[in-house]
Amino acid sequence: MMFLPRLYARLCARQAGRTLLANRITQNYSQFMRCPETDVPVDFLHQNAHELSGFNFVEQIFPPALWARNVRFDLHAYVAQWTQEQAFYSSSRTLLLGMRWAGFGLIVDALLATAPADVRFQFITRHPALHKLMAAHEGRRASSFFAPHRLVTVLLMDERLPDAPLFSTQAGDQKAWLTDVSTRFLSRYGYSVRTLLPICSLHAAEFGLESQAYAPEDYRQAAADTLNALRKTPTLWSAWDDLSVIYHG
């Protein structure tokens, strides 16, 4: 990671436990993970702040052309090989389910940069970094739903869109509300459903991605699996202060 975002990440991590937001994040972590606040891992706030602040700095301040330089390995080469191994673009239309992970924008940037020439993308989100990214890859923008290109539609499961339909699922033993999508629509237009999850931090040498493919009728299961993956890598999620969106819709 470049000097400025690395410095900013260290400063934010140093201050992480001394803010009012830290109390809210601790309470939300305790609620979601079903543990007393006294059992929240001591380093959780510091690690979470370090992960998020550095990559958020990159996505907000730097142009997308510089994003990949903030990873210690060749992210584009990794993603190109990984998508090939996964047959990631084998469907004519793919609904890609993500969440607001640390560095999610950098991963999507690598997808945009390395996808086959006939693949186009569209984002259903209000996330400013992703709109900034799409503007930088204008040639990848889907011009028409019925254009003769393979299409990847990116939907963030932990974001609430205006007037979006919701469905109820379980986050552990708690009820949660996620964005619903018509399985009839997905089936009619030949969509497959895919998840996109980090195995560990983009800072780590052992970084990797995992993805599962689902049939259109299993959309809700894919969405629930995406949410519950949060339990594996809680320090990488950027929305611990926004848990009410999931619990109350």
Question: Where are the predicted features?
Answer:
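Membrane-anchoring hydrophobic helices of lipid-metabolizing enzymes
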Residues: M1-G98
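A structural signal for well-ordered alpha-helical scaffolds and beta->alpha junctions
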Residues: L21-A22, T26, L130-H131, T179, ...
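Generic structural marker for isolated residues within well-ordered, non-membrane alpha-helices
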Residues: T26, V108, T226
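Non-catalytic C-terminal accessory region of glycerolipid acyltransferases
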Residues: V42, S92-R93, A113-T114, R140-G249
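Catalytic cores of transferase enzymes with a strong primary signal for eukaryotic protein kinases
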Residues: E51, F55, L111, R231
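Short catalytic/ligand-binding loop motif for oxyanion handling, primarily in non-cytosolic enzymes
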Residues: I61-L66, G103-L106, H131-K132, P162-A164, ...
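Amphipathic coiled-coil/heptad-repeat helices and related helical stalk/stem segments
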Residues: Y78-Q81, F104, L178-T179, A222
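Catalytic core of membrane glycerolipid acyltransferases/transacylases, capturing the structured
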Residues: S91-R150, T169
